[in-house]
Amino acid sequence: MTKRYWNINLEEMMKAGVHFGHGTKKWNPKMAPYISAKRKGIHITNLTRTARFLLEACDLVFDAASRGKQFLIVGTKNKAANLVAWAAIKARCHYVNKKWLGGMLTNWSTTETRLHKFRDLRTEQKTGRLNRLPKRDAAMLKRQLSHLQTYLGGIKYMTGLPDIVIIVDQHEEYTALRECITLGIPTICLIDTNCDPDLADISIPANDDAISSIRLILNKLVFAICEGRSSYIRNP
């Protein structure tokens, strides 16, 4: 795997609040190796460990992107949703930021059918065919289109299972993580002090509640993916 410099520094992570964990009563003992202290009733994440795993994740996504691999970014809680969409669009990744529909990956044939329906409806809307239908039929199909746009809009160009899935919140996206584990899809996951570090392929200990923390982690991963994609374009 290619080793590169990703400009990951502890001061920047401290400013973003990456080190702030959950209250000491809400923790997973498996996170003990990633916790450096307790402060005012909350656990403090060891940022040296965070930097190590973030570096490893950046190397992985760069290497994958440089070989033309496909990524899916998942983060559906309100405070992360816009960041997830922004990061995915910038790095030309697929994303889910509203609600994870159970079986989205493990029942891919059903998802594929929904995507075909979504594409057909979008085409009918663009060509004006929907407006030529009886009002009741048009209204029903427009509601369907709106529903599909909300939940599948971020994966509308996905033609198969992703090669790597990036998950912003382990607890919130547990169903998505389990589907990836079932299918053997490599995962990168932000893990707060109440998470299980053993579930993802690369777990990055970090505050998964603060927007500034989520933004910093996604920024680093997106930059690495974009660099990898540039390398792929130059040397296909």
UniProtKB/Swiss-Prot annotation:
Entry GO MF terms: structural constituent of ribosome
CDD domains named in the record: RPS2 (cd01425)
Entries under InterPro entries matching the protein: Ribosomal_uS2, Ribosomal_uS2_bac/mit/plastid, Ribosomal_uS2_CS, Ribosomal_uS2_flav_dom_sf
UniProt keywords, alphabetically: Chloroplast, Plastid, Ribonucleoprotein, Ribosomal protein
Gene Ontology CC annotations of this record: chloroplast; mitochondrial small ribosomal subunit
Subcellular location: Plastid, Chloroplast
Top-level division of the source organism's lineage: Eukaryota
The keyword Ribosomal protein is annotated on this UniProt entry: yes
GO biological process: translation
Family statement drawn from the similarity comment of this UniProt entry: Belongs to the universal ribosomal protein uS2 family.
The protein's name in its UniProt record: Small ribosomal subunit protein uS2c
UniProt lineage: Eukaryota, Viridiplantae, Streptophyta, Embryophyta, Tracheophyta
